[in-house]
Each structure stands twice: as C-alpha cells, then as structure tokens.
Amino acid sequence: MKHFAGALAGSLLIAVAPPLHAEAYPKGAIGLIIPLAPGDATDTSARAMAEDVARELKVPIVPVNRPGAGGSLGVELLTKAKPDGYTIILANNASLVFRSILDPKTANYNPLTDLTPLGLAMRSPSIFAVRGDAPYRNFKELVEYAKKNPGKLRVGTAGVGSVGEFCVRTINTATGAGLIPIPFTGASPAVSALLGGHIEGIVLALGTVTAHLRSGALRGIVLSSKYPDFPDLPTMAELGYSEPLFGIWVAFFGPAGLPADVAGKLVPALEHAIKSPDIAAKLKPLGILTEYSPPDRLLAEIRNEHRRVEDIAKKSGLVK
C-alpha cells in the first residue's frame, strides 16, 4: 500500500511541481488532494474554496481527486508528499480518525503525527432520522420503543466503522436502547432501505436527507449539533446526555514537517476562503456549514475525537 501510494504521490507532485529554486513561497501551482470522487459534497466544497485560495496566493490551486479506501488513499498520498507547501488536502474525520483506528492496515497513518493541521473548514451535523409515519415521534419515545422491542430497531449507516455507526454506539451506551447498526455501502442505499421499510432508522450526514425531511417522508429525531434550518431538532446535550453524537468535519492539512513560514502563508489564505460569505451560501443547501478553526484548536479536536473513537471501538470489540 505504501509503495503504491508513493508512486501515486510522485505522479501528483510532478503534475503540480513548482519552479526549482523558488525564492519565496508560493512560486508555482499547489496541488489540492480531494480524497473522494468528483461530485461529492467535499469535492464541491474543495473546488469552491480552491478558487478563493488561488486569488489570495496568486498561484493556481489544482484540485486532484484521489478516491479510494474510504478516503484513506488520498490521505496516505499526502503523507508521502514533500513538506514544501505544494501539496495539501481537504479531508474529513471519517478518513482521518475513524479509518486510522479501525483499519490501520489500509489507513496506514496517524492523524496526530503524520499531518500538519492548517485549519478546520466546515461541519455537517449527523442526524438520526426515521420514517415520517414511525410510531416514535421523538428521542424519548424511540428509546422506549427500542427497550420494549429488543433487537427490533435497526439503524442504517453509511458503512462499517462510519461516523453514523459510532453515533449509534454512543446512543446505546448513553441509553441502553440496544439499537442495531446496519452498515450499507454509502448513504443512498441506507436512505432507500429506510424509505422502503427494510430498516427503522438511519444516522447519516444531514445533507443527505434534507429533501426528505422537508417533504415529510423522514422525521429527524436528534442532531449531533444545531443547524439553523432545523432549529427544533435537539442535540444530545439538550436531551440531557453528556456525550454528544459524532458529527462530520472537514479540514485542510499539509504533510508532517511543513515549515512554519510556509504554513504562515497557507493558513491566512485558507481562512479567507473558509470565511467567504459566497462560499458559505453555496454550501449551506448541501447541509454544510463553513466554520474556521485555527490549527492548534483543530489539533486539540482531533486528539479528543481520536480518544473517544478509540475508546468506543475497544469497548465494542471492534479493535483490541
């Protein structure tokens, strides 16, 4: 895997290699790895922000899609890149934190040591949703139903070890509901299964179900964090629980060892893009909220989430 990733990283760097003997950074194109397929919400976000960053730095930002292994391939490419500021990535916590804990053979990196945080870019809440005609109309009723009907409440997620699966496990720990996580190969199959009556709930990124929520086909039960378009949907904290659900966050990173002066040029340009009102307006309909957080706070969040995910994974028997 590392040999393969190294070869791909080499081809990526050649494609966007800066002029030799550059006097000041940046003097050439910067490659932006997008570890997901074209058309994904992260891809749309990355391309919108790349245009803004290019204007700020006055050099081209070249988006390069490198999907595969749930985003892990793109992250590993970054870890193989030279720490010169000419290769960065926009990646989410599913590939950075969750996969590195659950599948270290494929996700052969440590998000705490193998990357240089450059700034949080955006968040998308996770939502627990049920069909609009479900007999449980709120979180309390859902938990009561699950306890009275052990093993009967199946909850679809986007895959094994996904953010949604860990949300289900968090709810089970907090309430004793005994919800059964059912992994699908992505969000769309899970939504289809719920609408078709094959499962009783889903936990997915909010943006994947907003249309169904507005039509009444689905009903939201709880969110990982507040979202302005659905102000009445509660969070776990508002329901009296101390452990929040996991949301989805996306952030910019460079390779480990990125020089401070290079990061000092990148960070303000990325911050400008993340705080752009035009970009925020473009992404909001996708269920994405732009939110800037500086590198030190981003690293602290990664440490905390890494600890939580690892703890749940061990208690659930997912890892030793």
Regions found by a protein language model. Give the residues of each.
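Stable alpha-helical elements in mature extracytoplasmic
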Residues: 41-45, 49, 70, 74, ...
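C-terminal lobe and pocket-closing loops
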Residues: 123, 209-275, 304-307
